[in-house]
């Protein structure tokens, strides 16, 4: 396992979650609309996961491309997991994003993702 890559993914995951939650708690009615359609950060996250996950899955080694892809993958994962819980547990309104159930769900899912990286790291120790 590339421990540096794991650290970058977890750092991007946690940083993106904290920044997104902070920004949207300050300005909860900030929406990203395209052609009259509200684009939730779940969809932005899925695009980042796809675009950045492919190079990570297909290219071995360490390069500037895999470093950037690691940041994008972690950021996309944070966006998708945070919004996923919010859309399941609430009515999807901007005000509901600020509810404790939404925050707790986001913390739980992002925490599970970071914990999963740690478990994979520990399981890979001693392997070539």
What are these regions, as identified by a protein language model?
Residues 45-55, 107-120:
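Hydrophobic cores of alpha-helical transmembrane segments in multi-pass inner/ER membrane proteins
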Residues 66-73:
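Cytoplasmic-side transmembrane-helix entry/capping segments in multi-pass membrane proteins
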Residues 31-47:
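Loop-to-helix transition at the N-terminal end of transmembrane alpha-helices
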Residues 13-27, 53, 75-83:
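Alpha-helical transmembrane segments of multi-pass membrane proteins
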Residues 1-10:
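N-terminal membrane topogenic signal
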Residues 85-102:
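Interfacial helix-loop-helix junctions of multi-pass membrane proteins
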Residues 120-128:
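Membrane-interface capping segments at transmembrane-helix boundaries
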């Amino acid at each position: 396992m590339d421990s540096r890559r794991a650290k970058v993914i977890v750092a991007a995951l946690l940083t993106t979650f904290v920044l997104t939650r902070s920004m949207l708690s300050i300005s909860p009615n900030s929406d990203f609309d395209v052609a009259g359609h509200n684009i939730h950060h779940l969809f932005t996250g899925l695009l980042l996961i796809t675009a950045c996950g492919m190079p990570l899955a297909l290219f071995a080694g360490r390069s500037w491309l895999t470093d950037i892809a690691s940041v994008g993958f972690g950021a996309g994962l944070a966006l998708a997991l945070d919004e996923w819980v919010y859309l399941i547990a609430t009515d999807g309104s901007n005000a509901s994003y600020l509810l404790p159930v939404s925050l707790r769900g986001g913390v739980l899912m992002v925490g599970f993702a970071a914990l999963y990286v740690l478990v994979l790291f520990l399981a890979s120790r001693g392997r070539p």
